[in-house]
Amino acid sequence: MMKLNIKNETSRLRAVILGTAESPGPTPEYENAYDPKSAEHIKAGTYPLEEDIVKEMEAVREVLEKYDVQVFRPNLVKDLNQIFTRDIAFVIDDKFIKANILPDREEEIEAIQYVIDQIDPNKVIELPEDVHVEGGDVMLYNDHLFIGAYYGEDYPQFITARTNLNGVEHIRKMFPNKKVHSFNLRKSNTEARDNALHLDCCFQPVGKGKAILYKDGFLDEKEYEWLVNFFGKENIFEITQQEMYDMNSNVFSISEDVVISERNFTRLNTWLRENGMTVEEVPYAEIAKQEGLLRCSTLPLIRD
């Protein structure tokens, strides 16, 4: 049996499920896009090609293996986008929680069933139907849990709203020992620059007590300010709207000292290095066109 352990975003990583970019299927129809950024690229004819995204994901696999991380990959399902494993499930402490994802993504969970089979079945949690939480909205910080959500009555109208208040409450009940903080995120079905698809599109802790943050991803300025006070202004790297659009907050930590980042994130990578971190740069700009980056395409199972 695999003993899961995830308590934060930065402890030394030992095992992870990395998505796969092979056989993602034809470019989706414009009206079938799940998010505004993919739609933008479908329309412009710049939607990523399979060979490019396969190369990008291989670069990440190489970095993970260089640090002796055990890397699981989903079983290949032909013509299915299986890049973003973070959406389909997530781990809190020693629990593996399956997300209630869009129905046509069920096959993605089946493709990692061989991994789930290695986990104690009592630790594998299925959520009730009206409880929506995706891994990109769940950020762990030891005793604290940060959860991105959308509070509006019009939640069902937003294909970009992936976590609801039922989701926040359900997690709160499941983990009574954690301090759960929720954040109301800005959503747009049509304009990627005004859309925080998940919490990790506008916030992520890195290193020792530092964080990357994008102010306008939060609908309530008080919630944004709470985060600033929690980490301390001097420990925060504020990103611009363009950097948010390019997915700067969606890097992925192997440890407090090692971060995998996109090679074009010049300003962020400089800041990470100035703060004592080793930055492993990879090309990920094609995958970013689907409104997801490094954190979105990883599902950590075990950290120290």
What are these regions (language model features)?
Residues 1-304:
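The feature marks the mature, well-folded catalytic cores of soluble enzymes
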